[in-house]
Amino acid sequence: MTRRRVLSVVVLLAALACRLGAQTPEQPAPPATTVQPTATRQQTSFPFRVCELSSHGDLFRFSSDIQCPSFGTRENHTEGLLMVFKDNIIPYSFKVRSYTKIVTNILIYNGWYADSVTNRHEEKFSVDSYETDQMDTIYQCYNAVKMTKDGLTRVYVDRDGVNITVNLKPTGGLANGVRRYASQTELYDAPGWLIWTYRTRTTVNCLITDMMAKSNSPFDFFVTTTGQTVEMSPFYDGKNKETFHERADSFHVRTNYKIVDYDNRGTNPQGERRAFLDKGTYTLSWKLENRTAYCPLQHWQTFDSTIATETGKSIHFVTDEGTSSFVTNTTVGIELPDAFKCIEEQVNKTMHEKYEAVQDRYTKGQEAITYFITSGGLLLAWLPLTPRSLATVKNLTELTTPTSSPPSSPSPPAPPAARGSTSAAVLRRRRRDAGNATTPVPPAAPGKSLGTLNNPATVQIQFAYDSLRRQINRMLGDLARAWCLEQKRQNMVLRELTKINPTTVMSSIYGKAVAAKRLGDVISVSQCVPVNQATVTLRKSMRVPGSETMCYSRPLVSFSFINDTKTYEGQLGTDNEIFLTKKMTEVCQATSQYYFQSGNEIHVYNDYHHFKTIELDGIATLQTFISLNTSLIENIDFASLELYSRDEQRASNVFDLEGIFREYNFQAQNIAGLRKDLDNAVSNGRNQFVDGLGELMDSLGSVGQSITNLVSTVGGLFSSLVSGFISFFKNPFGGMLILVLVAGVVILVISLTRRTRQMSQQPVQMLYPGIDELAQQHASGEGPGINPISKTELQAIMLALHEQNQEQKRAAQRAAGPSVASRALQAARDRFPGLRRRRYHDPETAAALLGEAETEF
């Protein structure tokens, strides 16, 4: 690492990140109080951005023990292009649709002052295929459910009415990506008309739920967004060998099945293969895909310049774009497995594009793409390249073959050193060819620009080529070691600097603006949120409004986010980073002067007020240099160190969400229909009388059952009569007729009441209507000579009539005889003498007793 780079990193860490919440929108500042930085119009890797809004990202860690690969006589360095793939841990996501019918039975108590819900019972049922067709095309369903349980068939109808076709309408939901369509969103809880009675109301709701489902490799099960689990592979079609642990008769596949979007009802979409699964309480369907729709590998990075160091037992792929060294356990490449064929097209396309960019300096000859698996579980796609300068010398050497010397001019024997050098070169070439993962490059066709094959310069060219190759490989080894050592030191420095400001360090590593934060011993890296560059303005004043002693230590910035018209305020950080806070303040100092860099400019503030703007070149730059250390180091094959395995990390979590949801769904299916909401019943006890009466009838056996049936029959008959009367009253003709009859009865009652009142007030006039006229004639003397009888005679007549009436009543009672109750009472008196009332028929005894009683008083 150069001193210039270390110094720049230290300068970048001068401002500590203050991670606070986002501010509320502010009013734009007047133009006279702001200055527009030219960095908003420049193309830079560090635009104005906000890095405090990102909450998560990719996890990285710095290696604590990095050692560089060694270079020796047995090593071979090769340049090339490298693509790195990792396991795809992102689950396979696909759309699913759930169909269900929810039957809700509510027991309503009609109280004197208020109505109460004393019980609620809810059951869910799956939907048959003939009804799912209607729900998927015209969004209609039947509002009834027919089910058979324990040999008893029951039919539930919405609103306790008749089975009709109803429409499904969109409803709201809480989960993201979930859309529901329901036929009945309101529960039927109307109480009965009779007070102090219970009434059961039924609600049937057809529900469609569109959501997402996820499944991880090896696809033994998948989970929906709402937590429903299915113990099968989403790629199972009934014929392949995918995982299937559901009931065999619950799954079927339909071809050319059509699903219409709710907004596009009436259209004819393209058919698809769709799987249907009956879970008992709901039905699931999803588009059936092949396993090839999911790629088990994910592209991580592509390195344009990579050095492959072959050590005899392993290959080290060292890149110049980061402190990365990929080690393989073998020196022979493999063919791409069939399970990973999904990346072949991407690899070929990327390698072709990268090679076209460097083909003026490198050639690949007939080299093919080779694949390696690292000890850390990564898949490497490797394309070796050869510099064109070395390829020319190599072709000349291969085209030139030694020939026997003519007798006239025998060639002198080679010295021992030369022979050793030549044999060593051949040995290294053979070892290199045996260690290469790719097929050896065949000799190229002879060119027309070369001389004869017995060229005396052949040995010299061969020696020159071997020496050149040895020197180039040694130089590449020295460069690789020096570069690796520098990266090792930089790794240690950066690891310590991330404890101070991880955002600045990771931004310098990536070469672009990123957000980073430490999570214990690892670093989370995520993208920053760019702002609208055209709206960024700097405040000219750094003084805190309303305070004479406090000033801002960093200038204020006004900005707006992209696609947002609201203006926000923050403070300018290092490398155009904007902090969503105005907490960086200090006590105002006299004659202060600050320099703040923004793009290619530096803003100068004197006495906390913008003074001028100068060019970045106006400030001198410190130059540092680190000498290259070419000392040899031994080769070390690093093993992949994993502090905690994936299974251990899963086991360390208290909440196993997969296990919880799977167990919950298993238990929920077993107890479906048995759940009751008894909170109101327990607190108020309004149905205890009904439960107690039911237990009493059950204890009586057949007698209690007969009584219950009799009461139910009578109650049902009475309820039917009342319901019929209410239905007849609701009819227009019946209601009018009943109103007319009620009006007639009211008029009749009023007439009889008046007649009775007249009878009680003037009984003689009611019995003899002409008595008033006769009295008037008698008073005027015009009528016949009729004189009224005396009052004594009238009373005698009335007394005679009364006695006659009483005598007729006694005669009727004697003729009727004693009643049953009287005879029973008389029999009891005869059996129990103590109950008899004593009668004293003897006058003397009665007189004696009366005398004794008078004496006592």
Swiss-Prot record:
Residues 678-730, 709-729 are annotated as: Hydrophobic membrane proximal region. InterPro entries: Glycoprot_B_PH1 (IPR035377), Glycoprot_B_PH2 (IPR035381), Glycoprot_B_PH2_sf (IPR038631), Glycoprotein_B_ecto_C (IPR055341), Herpes_Glycoprot_B (IPR000234). Disulfide bonds join 51-528, 68-484, 141-206, 295-342, 551-588. It is found in: Virion membrane; Host cell membrane; Host endosome membrane; Host Golgi apparatus membrane. Its main location: virion. It is a single-pass type I membrane protein. Residues 754-857 are intravirion. The record marks 432-433 as: Cleavage. The keyword Oxidoreductase does not apply. A proteolytic cleavage by host furin generates two subunits that remain linked by disulfide bonds. Belongs to the herpesviridae glycoprotein B family. Homotrimer; disulfide-linked. Binds to heparan sulfate proteoglycans. Interacts with gH/gL heterodimer. This is Envelope glycoprotein B. The gene is gB.
